[in-house]
């Protein structure tokens, strides 16, 4: 029987080779999750090692399926394609949602700047306040222009 660390190491090695760790616990040892490679039969890494050592004939089906599973070639292109397919969709969704959030921020910024612009109008008749108001209006218009150009890019 393998130790807990050895079982964990075996599970990790199988997972690195493309095997799936299932949520089904082995009915024999009642400790280790079952493993499977695509459509092949499930197996327990702990019990397979016990069977190899003891050559138990009562579990021939499990022992026979293990070498077949281990000898199957691992298709790196299929795994790579599958990984690209699963990662592209969330990245695209995140990119689109972050783009929408950015557009929303720019829209709110433009609205706020336009309301500040409205607050500056009508222009004051006093000369010293007129210059300050014109400078602020110019700055607001520049910020609105910048925000709109960022939205379109």
Swiss-Prot record:
Its main location: cytoplasm. Keywords: Cytoplasm, Nucleus. Residues 72-98 are annotated as: Disordered. GO terms for cellular component: cytosol; nucleus. InterPro entries: SSSCA1, UPF0148_domain. It is found in: Cytoplasm; Nucleus. The keyword Iron-sulfur does not apply. The keyword Manganese does not apply. Pfam families: Auto_anti-p27. This is Uncharacterized protein C3B8.8. It comes from Schizosaccharomyces pombe (strain 972 / ATCC 24843).
